[in-house]
């Protein structure tokens, strides 16, 4: 019999509810990490799932490292010898980057690509600001100020559009002049990334999504492999992250999401796939 430790009844239910779509509403300080750790161990010990068949997405690297450490320790205490590093644990960005690296030859990126951090991205736009300042309607889009400030505003627009997976052609053909300007800004920026063999944090997810959508074999291999997905802080996921989750989980449908805001979970409730609606208000809410 599985040793749940000091888990209460609601946590035990969350740990052992492994099949289908599972929603756990949980507030801060209510044992979310404890429950996710036990759930991963339960899958390995009781269900015979291999570490590489589990994906766990967090919103900070610190949270991901904590999960890895605690799962490793928990398995060691149970004398279960597996390589936890084979699990897909990390932020959405790190998980998407891992998928890209594993299939780099199927992306637009070459082997010596460079990943831009926030400053690098802003500096790239600043250094190439002349490519943006002649775009029709750019002055109406940006506030008055120097090129550095306006470069920062451009990056904000670009990142938001990338995260929401907005179609460039749709933007550029929109009836609204301001929307068309945004489309041109995004187009110029993406050309810069391609020319420089560059990728930034927001386009990591876009490139990963494109990779999966344009390469059926890669998608099917990942869908076969990743049998269980767990997403922490689900209410904070953006559109493209959600699309990637449901794309990867489309075969097995074993997706567990944890969130502390009922309103923020409405998208999951509206999923077309049947799911288990698990509430644990006494201990996980």
Where do the PLM segments sit?
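Single conserved hydrophobic/aromatic residue that forms the stacking wall/gate
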Residues: 277, 284-285
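Generic alpha-helical structural context detector
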Residues: 16, 94-97, 101, 156-159, ...
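ATP-hydrolysis module of ASCE/P-loop NTPase motor domains
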Residues: 17-18, 83-86, 105-198, 202, ...
């Amino acid at each position: 019999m599985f040793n749940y430790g000091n888990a209460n009844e609601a946590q035990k239910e969350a740990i052992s509810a492994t099949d289908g779509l599972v929603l756990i509403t949980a507030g801060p300080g209510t044992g979310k990490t404890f429950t996710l750790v036990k759930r991963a161990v339960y899958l390995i010990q009781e269900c015979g799932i291999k570490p590489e068949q589990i994906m766990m997405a967090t919103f900070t690297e610190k949270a991901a490292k904590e999960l890895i450490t605690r799962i490793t320790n928990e398995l060691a205490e149970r004398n279960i010898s597996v390589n936890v590093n084979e699990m897909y644990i990390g932020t959405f960005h790190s998980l998407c980057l891992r998928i890209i690296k594993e299939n780099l030859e199927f992306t637009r990126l070459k082997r010596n690509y460079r990943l831009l951090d926030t400053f690098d991205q802003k500096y790239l736009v600043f250094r190439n600001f002349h490519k943006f300042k002649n775009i029709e309607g750019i002055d109406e889009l940006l506030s008055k100020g120097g090129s550095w400030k306006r470069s920062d505003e451009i990056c904000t627009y670009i990142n938001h559009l990338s995260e929401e997976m907005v179609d460039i052609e749709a933007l550029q053909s929109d009836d609204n002049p301001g929307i068309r300007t945004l489309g041109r800004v995004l187009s110029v920026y993406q050309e810069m990334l391609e020319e420089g063999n560059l990728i930034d944090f927001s386009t990591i997810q876009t490139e990963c999504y494109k990779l999966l959508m344009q390469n059926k074999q890669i998608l099917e291999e990942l869908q076969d492999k990743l049998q269980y997905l767990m997403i922490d802080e689900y209410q904070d996921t953006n559109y493209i992250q959600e699309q990637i989750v449901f794309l990867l989980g489309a075969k097995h449908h074993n997706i567990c999401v944890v969130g502390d805001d009922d309103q923020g979970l409405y998208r999951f409730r509206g999923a077309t796939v049947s799911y288990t609606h698990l509430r644990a208000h006494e201990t996980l809410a």
